[in-house]
Amino acid sequence: MQEATEPPPPKRKNKGTVVAPKGHGTLQAIDISTNGPVEIKYHLNLPHALEKIMQVNLLTLPTNLTPQRLRTLDSSGLRALVLELRPCRAEVWTCLPRGLVSMTTIETEDGHADADNIVEREVQAPSLNFPLKFLVKGSQVQLIHEVHPVNRCEYCGRLYKHKHECSARRREFYFHHINSHSSNWWQEIQFFPIGSHPRTERLFLTYDVETYTWMGSFGKQLIPFMLVMKLSGDQRLVNIAYDIAMKLKWDRWRQDPQTFYCITPEKMAVGQHFRQYRDQLQTALAVDLWSSFLKANPHMHEWALEHYALTDPTDLTFEELKKLPHVRGTPRFLELYIVGHNINGFDEIVLAAQVINNRAEVPQPFKITRNFMPRAGEILFNDVTFALPNPAYKKRADFQLWEQGACDDIDFKYQFLKVMVRDTFALTHTSLRNAAQAYSLPVEKGCCPYKAVNQFYMLGSYRAEKDGFPLEEYWKDHEEYLLNRELWEKKSQPRYDIIQETLNYCALDVLVTAELVAKLQESYAHFIRDSVGLPHVHFNIFQRPTISSNSHAIFRQIVYRAEKPNRTNLGPGLLAPSHELYDYVRASIRGGRCYPTYIGILEEPLYVYDICGMYASALTHPMPWGTPLNPYERALAVREWQMTLDDPATISYFDKDLLPGIFTIDADPPDEFMLDPLPPFCSRKGGRLCWTNEPLRGEVATTVDLITLHNRGWRVRIVPDELTTIFPEWKCVAREYVQLNIAAKERADKEKNQTMRSIAKLLSNALYGSFATKLDNKKIVFSDQMDESLIKGISAGTVNIKSSSFLETDNLSAEVMPAFEREYLPQQLALLDSDPEDSEDEQRSAPFYTPPAGTPGHVAYTYKPITFLDVEEGDMCLHTVEKVDPLVDNDRYPSHVASFVLAWTRAFVSEWAGFLYEEDRGTPLEDRPIKSVYGDTDSLFVTQRGHELMETKGKKRIKKHGGKLVFDPDEPDLTWLVECETVCVSCGADAYSPESIFLAPKLYALKCIYCPACHKTSKGKLRAKGHAAEALNYELMVNCYLADMQGADRQRFSTSRMSLKRTLASAQPGAHPFTVTETTLTRTLRPWKDRTLAALDAHRLIPYSRSRPNPRNEEVCWIEMP
């Protein structure tokens, strides 16, 4: 029985309207010869169009021009067609990339074509008395019907005949992505999660060196004689490092099996030994990574032999290895950290000529990249990466893991071994002893007499007691001498062994640094998990070199979590100014105040008030957010701003109708009787940053500054400028970051957790600095590490080599010097106190004593002849390269945030000025009482009258009376607090200095601090930047001022201190790369001479104004008179 089949479904009828094909096409483009927009209307059917135009002119096409031939005609056959038709003029419009067209002519009669556009010449009588125009699109040829000019919208770029619709979205897109002039002004900020890979294997090599002074050809050079290192981290990597140390015969410190040392006075010997160890260690780790890669890809042997005739895959290059198919295996990530305290500015430079080696014998398939960046005399980066392909790498589609701050295998293009140098001082900003206390680490009592050690290595002896213990002159003070003597006597040793004692103290410092490394790792990871709220993050504080870079990474992670942009950047809300806009935004970043308004001795009460966490409070205020407006919307916003500024009424900082932006402005001050000693703005027009009451011309300022100037009575005019930037909205972008740190600090205070308090305070203060980071187009590279793009840039002239330096190396000639035959003058041998506890270089010179021969009680030591190696090698060359284009490419820092942070701080100080000086406005400046005598960026020194005004008018801003430190968007208001810094150490009440002396900016002294409540007196305050502060006192500064006023010889008032001159890469002939030399800095002590204020009388200074103009300002400014 057959089954019934289902009938087929009914055939669907197509519905629609049949239309005839279009006969014409339209093309709008820019004519490159006139730079004007044109519209080209052309025929879509070339055979039909040519036939019709011939018929209109009562002509026929040649018989050989068949429709088939014309239909298949391309650009290569166009010339033959024109010569066959011979029109009186033949134009060829060729389509170019990016919406451009060019017009050329094919001449068929001599003298009838444009001489500038002739591409062919053929002298023959025309057969057509009308012109022909052809359009070439790719290889296709069409006949043009007509070409006529059209209009172009300057805001959206659309071409039109009469009118068009210009949408806001199109205007934004055209301004930021199409317009060649402005499309690179703002760049998206790249983002990668803050955490590191969870399977990262780490090895830490913590070290410290001790040096002595050697008189060389480049001055008093510091030479290492001792190096102690400790190994820690993943046990398997520690075992590898341990075996290499034993193989190279490093001495083990008896108190810790993982600590090794090397002692030798030979110049460069310590560096060579350390370099050899570091080279072999990184080679061993690289081989370990390569072995695991080989094991996971056994087919590589056969593939290398088949494609490159290599029996050993180790001979492959990285470019060849990238072509390996079907790469397998789990990627590995190894990190080797070379860590020390305050090594970037000293130890790494001293050792760098020996330890920097670009020829370590790592397997050839690795891609080797180096990130080397010296900055301000320190090695900020010195990282080397050995990379292999990562088989798991792919483009990320889901970004939820990134929002949690974590990453996995697919996010890394390469598996790698990274060798990085890290300085714990850059992460703590304090001495090792202070850092140990801040992070609750045990610290051994006592210290080492480094002055005696230095003298011992220089001369072979030092002054000592009978048992060899250094005399009191080598110690800081009598108490230190007694303490260390007592500690040594407890060891019950017959004689004091200065080398052994130095080794023990150096090793203990290394152990403390190693404990600090572990504590920093653990504490910061805990902070990120608990305080920041990222429990899945494997955070490693040493992944980034400084506290500033870590704070910026935390900030970016918080923004990414909040905004969820689902991309590899922070999205359009927070952009980085670049190229022309970078320089424009940098022009709006103005530093803080620091100058006295009183020179001389002030004999009246003086209180010091300081803003609490000024930058942190400013960061919580609204900042610009979003993609900057296009010129059309920008013009409307500027008009709104100017109308508001023309109204004399007070403007609110938080008016929602006024958008944030950065403008070029002119501003005129009010009448001089209405001016204040604290101007609302500053200018660099005279070459020096001056806080001035003069008219401002062509200054770049934020909208916050416009409000501050307006509310202080200034008349502000916005100057038209194409670089003017206005943002679509305000947003408290950094408020969450600051709140997290403040909450963590308060919680740490309650729990008495000094470690977490230190972390929160450091991170809170570091963020502003990262926004203000200044970039340039310079970089320093090793000659054999120049990549292909850099070499091409140098060849093309887009990159210049500014200077080249060669490193001192160790493998050619040698000079043998018998033991201490050279004679030294005492002044040549001012010794350096190389105490590793001290992170500053402002140390007094040590006393020097030359012992007579055979003096009893001295420790004498005779060295064998010392070998000094001092040569150059051509390939150890550093190049400083710089782009020819001065414009900076920035995709990292939203610099405009720094500009607004500083603008908010100026708003704080402007309100502060209102408390103090509002009652004086209308009175001539010379008749006003003194209310403040010194101003710093975040502090004011006020008199008794100023103190009374702060307790009345400014009461809401004094911290002890309550108040907020974090801006509240629901109740917008300026949010800042101050506290009196001069407080009684006994009862805590506000105290004052009854007498003070002011000589210059950052050069002043308060005689003492007197408490009117309990009538107790405590130590005063002295500030002397650039001087050896321990050599100064209040009486000396008073004598200096009085001598200057009386015309006495002031040269006798000076201070001297020992300083370290660090040279990394320099074009100076007298400075050798990678050396640290010791110099003596002598500074004259005198009152301020090159003042940036005008003198009102013998003591009082006031800002420049119309009646007292800045004599440095010679800039000519055009002003149109109405």
UniProtKB/Swiss-Prot annotation:
Catalytic activity of the protein: DNA(n) + a 2'-deoxyribonucleoside 5'-triphosphate = DNA(n+1) + diphosphate
InterPro entries, per database record: DNA-dir_DNA_pol_B (IPR006172), DNA-dir_DNA_pol_B_adenovir (IPR014382), DNA-dir_DNA_pol_B_CS (IPR017964), DNA-dir_DNA_pol_B_mt/vir (IPR004868), DNA/RNA_pol_sf (IPR043502), DNA_pol_palm_dom_sf (IPR023211), RNaseH-like_sf (IPR012337)
Localisation per UniProt entry: Host nucleus
Key words, A-Z: DNA replication, DNA-binding, DNA-directed DNA polymerase, Host nucleus, Nucleotidyltransferase, Transferase, Viral DNA replication
GO terms assigned for molecular function: 3'-5' exonuclease activity; DNA binding; DNA-directed DNA polymerase activity; nucleotide binding
GO BP terms, alphabetized: DNA-templated DNA replication; viral DNA genome replication
GO cellular component: host cell nucleus
EC number of this enzyme: 2.7.7.7
Family matches, as Pfam families: DNA_pol_B_2
Cystine bridges: none
UniProt signal peptide: none
The family this protein is said to belong to: Belongs to the DNA polymerase type-B family.
Any further remark recorded for this protein: This DNA polymerase requires a protein as a primer.
Subunit structure of this chain's protein: Heterodimer with the terminal protein; this heterodimer binds to bp 9 to 18 of the genome. Forms a complex with viral pTP, DBP and hosts NFIA and POU2F1/OCT1 for initiation of replication.
Function statement: Eukaryotic-type DNA polymerase involved in viral genomic replication. DNA synthesis is protein primed, and acts in a strand displacement replication. Assembles in complex with viral pTP, DBP, host NFIA and host POU2F1/OCT1 on viral origin of replication. The polymerase covalently transfers dCMP onto pTP, thereby initiating complementary strand synthesis.
Name of the featured protein: DNA polymerase
Organism: Human adenovirus B serotype 7 (HAdV-7)
Gene label: POL
